[in-house]
């Protein structure tokens, strides 16, 4: 008899909890969409020019805090604590620990599992780019540029344009336009520098098309990140609502008691 009363109270509390959750305020949907009209960014419209000037005082091809091709804390080709052909710690080959003919082997670096899990969950953080993350690869969008020549040129050269974008977490921006503007700036800058370093140059038509392609991908990336961010917030609200807390506390009381 007592067990039936306890089961009835648990059922009542469970129904009350879900009824309270159903009355929660619905989250707003992000604005904007694919190719919804004219450009939303100032400074566009100049033929052949870059419509997204880089911010923060850095020039094209200069990452934050250092020059391209310069690693942190040392030059290329210089290992830590010794020269090439020498093991760590200053010992010579074949001299190790008092035994004859042993090779001194450098210790293997330990993998930080927290960093691996964070990169898998939110995208890889790009070193030297001020905390930007690299999004997953996308299919390049089909875009019409208003002329047969440009449409054909885009179809023939789209493989030369980026299919991933750099971005920061959406909670660092007040709206979609700010996210997309910053995303386009850093992605176009990084792709242009990387490609020109390999000896390939872009024409004015290429720059125009790269900006359009990257803009569409940045909008898609924002919508994806915003939805994931909203779902995480909904989970926090779910488990922090008073009825759910009361139900969990009651169940723990029954288990412990």
Curated annotation (Swiss-Prot):
Residues 1-24 form the signal peptide. A lipid is attached at residue 234 (GPI-anchor amidated alanine). Cu(2+) 1 binds at residues 64-66. Cu(2+) 3 binds at residues 80-82. Residues 54-95 are annotated as: 5 X 8 AA tandem repeats of P-H-G-G-G-W-G-Q. Residues 25-234 are annotated as: Interaction with GRB2, ERI3 and SYN1. Belongs to the prion family. The lineage of its organism: Eukaryota, Metazoa, Chordata, Craniata, Vertebrata. Residues 235-257 form a propeptide. Monomer and homodimer. Has a tendency to aggregate into amyloid fibrils containing a cross-beta spine, formed by a steric zipper of superposed beta-strands. Soluble oligomers may represent an intermediate stage on the path to fibril formation. Copper binding may promote oligomerization. Interacts with GRB2, APP, ERI3/PRNPIP and SYN1. Mislocalized cytosolically exposed PrP interacts with MGRN1; this interaction alters MGRN1 subcellular location and causes lysosomal enlargement. Interacts with KIAA1191. It is found in: Cell membrane; Golgi apparatus. It is linked to Found in high quantity in the brain of humans and animals infected with degenerative neurological diseases such as kuru, Creutzfeldt-Jakob disease (CJD), Gerstmann-Straussler syndrome (GSS), scrapie, bovine spongiform encephalopathy (BSE), transmissible mink encephalopathy (TME), etc. Residues 55-100 have a biased composition (Gly residues). Residues 28-113 are annotated as: Disordered. One of its GO terms (biological process) is protein homooligomerization. SUPFAM superfamilies: Prion-like. Cu(2+) 2 binds at residues 72-74. PANTHER family: DOPPEL PRION (PTHR15506), MAJOR PRION PROTEIN (PTHR15506:SF2). Glycans are attached at residues 185, 201. InterPro entries: Prion, Prion/Doppel_b-ribbon_dom_sf, Prion/Doppel_prot_b-ribbon_dom, Prion_copper_b_octapeptide, Prion_N. The normal, monomeric form has a mainly alpha-helical structure. The disease-associated, protease-resistant form forms amyloid fibrils containing a cross-beta spine, formed by a steric zipper of superposed beta-strands. Disease mutations may favor intermolecular contacts via short beta strands, and may thereby trigger oligomerization. Contains an N-terminal region composed of octamer repeats. At low copper concentrations, the sidechains of His residues from three or four repeats contribute to the binding of a single copper ion. Alternatively, a copper ion can be bound by interaction with the sidechain and backbone amide nitrogen of a single His residue. The observed copper binding stoichiometry suggests that two repeat regions cooperate to stabilize the binding of a single copper ion. At higher copper concentrations, each octamer can bind one copper ion by interactions with the His sidechain and Gly backbone atoms. This is Major prion protein.
């Amino acid at each position: 008899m007592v067990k039936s009363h306890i089961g009835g109270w648990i059922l009542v509390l469970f129904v009350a909890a879900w009824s309270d959750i159903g009355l929660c305020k619905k989250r707003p949907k992000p604005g904007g969409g694919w190719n919804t009209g004219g450009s939303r960014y100032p400074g566009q419209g100049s033929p052949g020019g870059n419509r997204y000037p880089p911010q923060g005082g850095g020039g094209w091809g200069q990452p934050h805090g250092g020059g391209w091709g310069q690693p942190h804390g040392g030059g290329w080709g210089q290992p830590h604590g010794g020269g090439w052909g020498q093991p760590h710690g200053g010992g010579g080959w074949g001299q190790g620990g008092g035994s004859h003919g042993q090779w001194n082997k450098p210790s293997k670096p330990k993998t930080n599992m927290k960093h691996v899990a964070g990169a898998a969950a939110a995208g890889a953080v790009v070193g030297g780019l001020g905390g930007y993350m690299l999004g997953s690869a996308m299919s390049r969008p089909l875009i019409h540029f208003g002329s047969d020549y440009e449409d054909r040129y885009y179809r023939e050269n789209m493989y030369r344009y980026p299919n991933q974008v750099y971005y920061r977490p959406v909670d660092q921006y007040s709206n979609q336009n700010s996210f997309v503007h910053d995303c386009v700036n850093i992605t176009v800058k990084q792709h242009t520098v990387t490609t020109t370093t390999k000896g390939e140059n872009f024409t004015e038509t290429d720059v125009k098309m790269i900006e359009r392609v990257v803009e569409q991908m940045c909008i898609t990336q924002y919508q994806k990140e915003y939805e994931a961010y909203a779902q995480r917030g909904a989970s926090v609200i779910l488990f922090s609502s008073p009825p759910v807390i009361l139900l969990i506390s009651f169940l723990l009381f029954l288990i412990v008691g």
